[in-house]
Amino acid sequence: MAGKVQEERKINKFPRLTINTRCSKLISNSEKGHKFPKEKPILVTCGLPYVNGPAHIAHLRTYVPADIFVRFLRKMGQEVVFFCGSDTHGTPITVKAEAEGVTPKKIMEKYHQHFVEFFPKIGIHFTNYGSTDHPLNHNRTIQIVDALKENGYVYSKMLALPYCPTCDRFLPDRYQRGVCPHCGASARGDECDQGCGRYLEPGELMDPRCSICGTKPEMIETRHYFLKLTAFEEFLREYLPAMDGTDIARNYALKWVEGGLKDWNITRNLDWGVKVPGEEGLVYYVWVDAPIGYIASTEEWAERTGGDWEYYWKGPGHLIHFIGGDIVYHHCLFWPAMLKGAGYDTPYAVVASGMVRVEGKIFSKSRGYVIWVEEDYLDRGLDPDALRYYIASYTGHTRDLDFNWSTYGEKVNKELVGTLGNFLYRALLFAHRNYGAIPEGEVEAEVRAEVEKAIEAIRDGLDEYQFKKISDAVLALAAYGNRYLQSREPWKLTKTDPEKAQGVIHNCLWLTKALAVLMEPVMPGKAAAIWRQLGQARRDAPLSEALEPLKVETILGKPAPLFEQIPEETIEELSEMVAKRIAEAEG
């Protein structure tokens, strides 16, 4: 490929970081061919939340699985860092700001702070959570585009674009609506959001109208910059089949490559965004600076801790992106091309999820098919760990998740209360009442085999990026615990064979400890509660701890149920809330 960056890599200059990015001894993955953990470092990112509104249920489809993945990697001794940040530029923010009579910066700052405070409430803790409006992101965006220019991958040309004479401005992206040239559906300026989902280049939209005033725009020529995406077609044909991750990411991207690539307009006529040096009223398109925000977030962390961001972006490691299924195009075509052309490492994996539905309908904020995580869930006192479990366990990661309150209630009541919580509370309560401490005993071979089976299923789930396999393994182990406890009947043995009863409870508490280890990445708050009831204040125990012996004679904490039954009346009330919202949106 012409114009390759002449940049010395200096891999050996990167020091091992002084912070604890590796939480336990590295577990071998050679015996059964597991992908993870890896000897090389891993950087995990999540698609940036767009800060024109609060967190909703569709956000969690990306962030919860990514957090589960990172937590398990750390349990296996993997060196891993986890980055995200707010996506702060683009027309959705400027349109909202105009509607509310405030500046785009006010909108951005309000919702950026919302997400900073929100993620810990749902148990998600990033190594760094940044912002694409941070000066580091402005600088890194300009540096990367400059590198692409130097290597012959960016050029400028005059382009006829829609201009609204009534509003006296060009109409980038969401400032116009019209007809998709590919499928004929109603579409916005940069994407067919109601039909085929295709990315639309400026000027492609048919029969455009100003989305603010409805005026039919004039076409006026103006200078814009383009990424020569066509120059990366051969690279993408080789890269995408080898890219790890979910099939929908690879297959969708390959389908678009097979259909023929076009050069990509990387600038917009706006004042809000990363300004193009030397060009008045021109900024880089939001999908240029947004993924660069992953790099800038790493730089923010490096400045704060004394780390080296290049260790992850130009070094020996693996880059893994977790994204929603609606942004595959950007992460599997534009982004690898930009990284390749500017001399950065390309992603090892792109993990794209299925879409989200609410009450059977395609997720839509404007049409009322939305669940606001704080207003509708957390503020009502509902359990954040139960929601994490629901997101992980509802279906396979690449299948559509259809959120409805009835299914949520059924999962909580049957699986969390009836199976997992039932075993844990029965085992801990019996032990506390009869012994007060962890009794002596030997772990039975059958019991140990069940835990080993659960660990293997979890590692398979990590390899395949299938988080339902992980939650199913936890639930299956709890179901086994219930069967074991019921079949051994220690309440009878305390009278007929006290020593055997003690051994049964020892095994039950050993299973309880294993569950605390294995469920922590899915339900960290509940795992911490189990450790306290086991008489320990542990967090982030390594995966190997699931198979380690109990500390006999440890004084047990006071047992308490982990989960609460959700009454049918509450489910009906929550379902009615969504129905009312939909009815109001539909007028």
PLM regions: where:
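Structured secondary-structure scaffolds
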Residues: 31-84, 136-139, 209-433, 470-474
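Long, amphipathic alpha-helical stalk/connector segments used for oligomerization, subunit docking
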Residues: 403-407, 412, 430-439, 451-467
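N-terminal, positively charged nucleic-acid-binding surface of large information/translation enzymes
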Residues: 26-238
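Short, solvent-exposed positions on alpha-helices
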Residues: 247, 418, 465-472, 521, ...
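Extreme N-terminal basic, low-complexity initiation segments
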Residues: 2-6
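Basic, alpha-helical terminal appendages of large translation-related enzymes
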Residues: 7, 12-13, 19-41, 85, ...
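Generic structural concept
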Residues: 417, 421, 448, 452, ...
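Short acidic alpha-helical/loop segments enriched in Asp/Glu that coordinate divalent cations
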Residues: 430-445, 467-473, 484-496
